[in-house]
Amino acid sequence: MKNVLLVIATVFALATPALAQTRWAVIVSGASGGEKYAEQMNTWRTDLRTVLLNRYQFKPEFVKMFVDEAATSGDKGSAENVRKFFAELKKSSSKDDFVFIILLGHGTFDGDVAKFNLVGPDMTAKDWTDMISGIQGRVALVNTTEASFPFLESLTSKGRVVITATDSAAQKYATVFPEYFIKAMKEASTDLDKNGRTSIYEIFAAASAAVKQHYEQRGQLTTERALLDDNGDGKGREASAEGPDGGIARIAYLDSEAVPANATPELAALIRRRQTLEQQAEEHKQLKGVMPDAEWNAQFEKLMLELAQVSAEIRKKSEK
């Protein structure tokens, strides 16, 4: 294992720009539920769009925003509009794309079916699962509403990052999670590993800690516990808990490192290969303890060796 540790250190030392891909951000603001919430959601939408454009350098044409019924301009957050957009996204997305979806507003659970409240007919967790199925590329969906846990159970898929504001469908009160999730997106301190980039996992962890502190400072029982799932088992875990989830979310960055303007097709292919290897390494970690140690170590070392070789080749070609 000494060789493996040496290789891992080498990989981090050889960090190089990642492949530029289309990064989509889809902000879905559903039915507001009243003037008080409408004002709050307008602030959240505005802050989200601003931080995505300014801090994370998303291109304006790839930031889609659906608004609540109180908004005077913009596409309404109706089931019809949302379905139409995602149908088009399925056609235009590619396997190298990253699609970040965040749901703002309110959710309900009637004891059987969980829904996200929209302007007009609501959409169930299954509706959302069916709608985003088939999107090419990496997908991260954050449901910030009350009663959101069933969305994690439904949307779970290996490699797909799903975050819900609650760990139970029974939590029926408006959540504070979106406030702290957006705040975490804006703060440099969220970059916990200090690598100059901010991952979905880091935002989730920072927001979760802030929610806990929110309730403690008010002397209240914590009624919402956010969960993250990215291994496809539909269970998820809290940021402060141990568990298999989080590997993919740790390398799902909101910001994108720039590819050199003179990048050749060969360099682009190498960068794609490195991203694939990084994901395979995270997935392989989930097999620790499941397969024989000797076999696990051999496969992991093989992945790390190739990752180091590819990273070295990328650095070499980037310096030309």
Question: Which residues does each predicted region cover?
Answer:
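Boundary/activation segment at the start of structured domains
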Residues: V4, A18-F100, G107, A114-F116, ...
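Bacterial N-terminal signal peptides
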Residues: L5-P17
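Second-shell loop/turn segments in exported
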Residues: A31-E39, D68-K76, L89, V113-V119, ...
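Extracytoplasmic/secreted proteins, especially bacterial periplasmic and envelope-associated proteins
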Residues: K36-D47, V51, G77, N81-E88, ...
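Active-site-proximal C-terminal subdomain of hydrolase catalytic domains
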Residues: T46, A140-D230
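Active-site microenvironments of hydrolase-like enzyme catalytic domains
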Residues: F86-G120, I135-V176
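Alpha-helical, heptad-rich or low-complexity scaffold/stalk segments
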Residues: T144, A263, L270-R273, E278-S318
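Caspase-like cysteine protease fold
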Residues: D191-E278
